[in-house]
Curated annotation (Swiss-Prot):
One of its GO terms (cellular component) is connexin complex. The gene is GJB7. One of its GO terms (biological process) is cell-cell signaling. This is Gap junction beta-7 protein. It comes from Homo sapiens (Human). Residues 41-75, 143-177 are extracellular.
Length: 223
């Protein structure tokens, strides 16, 4: 998936989002995506080639690397960015469907950008819930796969075909840890922003429903 396509996709969704949604978009692209691109190019460029073990046994280095890195950390972050962005397709598809119907019936879809009613409200709400679920799920997955969010400089490996317990060294552990912590913090920030936007939308809908019921309620005239 092209990052430019991803940007255009989310920009189209945010036409109907709240101010919190615009902040979320800025965090994703200014902090997470740009930092990811820098980290992928410079920090995780040749991670397997720079992984060293104090054993020359054929296959030992590859087995130890695969054990500690079952999936590349940088690829996992890329997958997370894609997965937290794709739920916005729900909103895009909903708007595209109604815009097509609007052209056929020559009827205005929404009063103005930022106004969400009916199906659009539900589609946007579901996309927020799914995005939040993916964010939390990937953080838990990352923590479980790598036993935390820090990269050790030394790992012990006793897997076959290693002749005994060998020491393996990871390149740039401090720099990788800093980048990972930054991405974790921005991911947590996105979760908080999603919860704020969810609360705002639900509260706004609740107040709107209460006002509508109050206005429809027949008024008793005093004599």
């Amino acid at each position: 998936m092209s990052w430019m396509f991803l940007r255009d996709l989310l920009s189209g969704v945010n036409k109907y989002s709240t101010g919190t949604g615009w902040i979320w978009l800025a965090v994703v692209f200014v902090f997470r995506l740009l930092v990811y691109m820098v980290a992928a190019e410079h920090v995780w460029k040749d991670e397997q080639k720079e992984f060293e073990c104090n054993s020359r046994q054929p296959g030992c280095k590859n087995v130890c690397f695969d054990d500690f890195f079952p999936i590349s950390q940088v690829r996992l972050w890329a997958l997370q960015l894609i997965m937290v962005s794709t739920p916005s397709l729900l909103v895009v598809l909903h708007v595209a469907y109604h815009e097509g119907r609007e052209k056929r019936h020559r009827k205005k879809l929404y009063v103005s950008p930022g106004t969400m009613d009916g199906g659009l409200w539900y589609a946007y709400l579901i996309s927020l819930i799914v995005k939040t679920g993916f964010e939390i799920g990937f953080l838990v997955l990352f923590y479980k796969l790598y036993d935390g969010f820090s990269v050790p400089y030394l790992i012990k490996c006793d897997l076959k075909p290693c002749p005994n317990t060998v020491d393996c060294f990871i390149s740039k552990p401090t720099e990788k840890t800093i980048f990972i912590l930054f991405l974790v913090i921005t991911s947590c920030l996105c979760i908080v922003l999603n919860f704020i936007e969810l609360s705002f939308l639900v509260l706004k809908c609740f107040i709107k429903c209460c006002l509508q019921k109050y206005l429809k309620k027949p008024q008793v005239l005093s004599v």
